[in-house]
């Protein structure tokens, strides 16, 4: 794998927002076109929710790719899960016109190296300013009080990771969905589930 900067999402963004998605607008048109790439079986209704959330919050266009089998090269036998950075390596060649970014989505557990731990389970991983990111719904379900909250975590994690590919870093505003969860569910439970004004401005969103 070539040298790239990855940003890790160590916990989900889990609070149901009191307000509906506010549709993002840019005078120049969509900031990116995201290829939504299922890795293994993935419910179509989940894809619908993810697409709607990405379009609404980030103002991106979305194209859907057919499902792909998870690559054997990403499998980590000692923990029986998939390495997120290797999944991104697999996904990156899927960025072909009109797509400018790719988001892989899977229901299986994923991991990366973090906090001095070789194999640390994560919700998602994104290339900062790069082409690819991947999320898993596996941890979205952990300690979730409802299916609705599980789905909200899934969608906001997707927005978070695509945000990293668009150049956003972790945000100091703890209410912003780009905040660094640091692995603490109670931290993400306090987020609004939306981008703050500063992060929206960085993307040129109204």
Predicted regions and their residues:
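The catalytic-center signature of Zn2+-dependent metalloproteases
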Residues: 140-206
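Fold-level signature of zinc-dependent metallopeptidase catalytic domains
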Residues: 31-43
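Cleaved targeting-peptide boundary
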Residues: 25-29
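N-terminal export signals
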Residues: 5-24
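A structure-centric signal for secondary-structure junctions around beta-strands
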Residues: 30-33, 99, 129, 193
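Metzincin-family zinc-dependent endopeptidase catalytic domain
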Residues: 41-157, 169
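Generic structural signal for residues positioned in beta-strands
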Residues: 35, 102-104, 133-134, 177, ...
């Amino acid at each position: 794998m070539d040298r790239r900067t990855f940003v890790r999402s160590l916990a989900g963004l889990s609070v149901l927002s009191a307000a509906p998605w506010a549709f993002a607008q840019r005078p120049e048109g969509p900031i990116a076109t995201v290829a939504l790439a299922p890795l293994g079986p993935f419910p179509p209704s989940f894809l619908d929710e993810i697409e709607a959330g990405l379009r609404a919050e980030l103002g991106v266009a979305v194209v859907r790719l057919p499902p792909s089998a998870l690559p054997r090269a990403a499998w980590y036998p000692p923990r029986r899960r998939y390495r997120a950075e290797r999944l991104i390596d697999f996904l990156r060649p899927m960025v072909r016109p009109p797509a400018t970014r790719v988001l892989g989505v899977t229901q299986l557990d994923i991991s990366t190296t973090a906090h001095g731990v070789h194999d640390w389970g994560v919700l998602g991983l994104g290339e900062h300013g790069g082409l690819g990111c991947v999320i898993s719904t596996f941890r979205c379900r952990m300690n979730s009080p409802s299916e609705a909250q599980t789905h909200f975590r899934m969608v906001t994690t997707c927005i978070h990771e695509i945000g990293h590919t668009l150049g956003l870093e972790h945000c100091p505003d703890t209410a912003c969905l780009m905040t660094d969860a640091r692995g603490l569910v109670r931290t993400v439970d306090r987020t609004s589930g939306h981008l703050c004004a500063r992060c929206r401005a960085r993307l040129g969103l109204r």
